[in-house]
Amino acid sequence: MYKKLYLIGILLLGLISGLTFNLIFFTVPYQLSEAKYTTDIIGAISLAAFPYCLKVIWSPFIDKYSIPFLGVKLGHRRSWALVSQIFLILAMMWFLKRSPCNNLCITAIILFIIAFFSSTQDIVLDAYRIERTTSKEELSIVFTFSSIGFRLGMLLGSVGSLYSSIIFGWNTVYKFALFITMVGPIVILCIKEPKLKTKRHTTNTLIDLQQYFEVIKKSIISFKNEQQYLLLIILFVFLYKAADSIPMAMSIPLFLDLSFTTHEIAVIYKAYGLLIMIVGGTLGGILAAKIGIFHSVLIGGVIQLLSPLMFMILATIGYDIKTFIITITIQNFCSGFAGTIISIYFASLCNSEFVATQYAISASFSSLSRIILASLGGICAKHLTWSVFFLCNTLFSMLFIPIFYTIYRKKLHFMNHSKKI
């Protein structure tokens, strides 16, 4: 019975993460689009999500520092989860008192604070899920429930927010998001602290924490030693993400500009699109297991080029439901397919001694690429027609192919040289 309640708790915590994530990346940008703000401003607002990219910086601090009193009463992970969620709720209360459209500077600051505590919560919950499991099978189940919860949170934050905004208004949408977030502390108090085989070495003072930050330094050095072409990989990831991040960031301004209704966007783009994304992600994982990571990455990248291409076709044709459905199908399938494969590729780059930190570094850079590309895309979209913008997006994204081919050649050369030695 407890196991079932524990999994429900994991699902609810995942839902809260997905809801707050979607608040920054979809709900507020959509409201600003409705208020006729330009694409460069909407793109700039996405910079408020920077904490999602930089969470690797303070994750060692969360791992090492024990919160006085709460750390003893609740345990290390639960105390951090509770504190991060309380501050997240306070930030959302502050956000609720203001209209996002009235003062964009204040809106960006509040969203940045929300992103900080939401990403802090994610750090803690990721560690909790890993430490709480005792086998690979249980780990798979726990992360599956967490993923389902995250997607449900995104669905509530998109389809739910759109319909609620029509019926009740945007203020009620944010009240609803706050109400769901307030469930988080209750869930944390109901679940148990992980039982570790070895004693955790933590401190409740700031002395000696500098030593722990050596983990990040060693991880980066190890990363560089393992991958002599690290700069090429960084450039590759940036270009690889361009075919997905830019269309995703500019999708709502485009759809509204083409006169698609809120109902059509909610049902086709968010609800139907989410299901297609799950299908694409599943098939991407299967392909990587069947034919290997390198070939899968290439296939995923090429398929992903169809996404901005379809947006260009939609922008050229204009309002057309059939073309809209085809575009959403291709865009979400490609996003799920390539997203899963690039995550597997990140994992393959990690040294076994520093898997957690190195994967966090890779994930942070991936998030950073998405935010930078979204911001640059917003600036470019203001000065180009939609058709020309997405054509340039397609051509720019194609540059990943020669970069990836160079990485592949260097990898083969390194492997052959190692065998000779």
UniProtKB/Swiss-Prot annotation:
The keyword Transport belongs to this UniProt entry's keyword annotation? yes
Q: Name one GO cellular component term.
A: plasma membrane
- Transmembrane region(s): 6-26, 41-61, 80-100, 104-124, 139-159, 166-186, 230-250, 274-294, 297-317, 324-344, 360-380, 388-408
Where in the cell is the protein located?
A: Cell inner membrane
Superkingdom of the source species:
Bacteria
Q: Does the keyword Cell inner membrane apply?
A: yes
What one GO molecular function would you report for this record?
transmembrane transporter activity
Which membrane topology term applies here? Answer: Multi-pass membrane protein
Keywords, A to Z? Cell inner membrane, Cell membrane, Membrane, Transmembrane, Transmembrane helix, Transport
Main localisation:
membrane
UniProt similarity note: Belongs to the major facilitator superfamily.
Q: Under what name is this protein listed?
A: Putative transporter AmpG 3
Origin species: Rickettsia prowazekii (strain Madrid E)
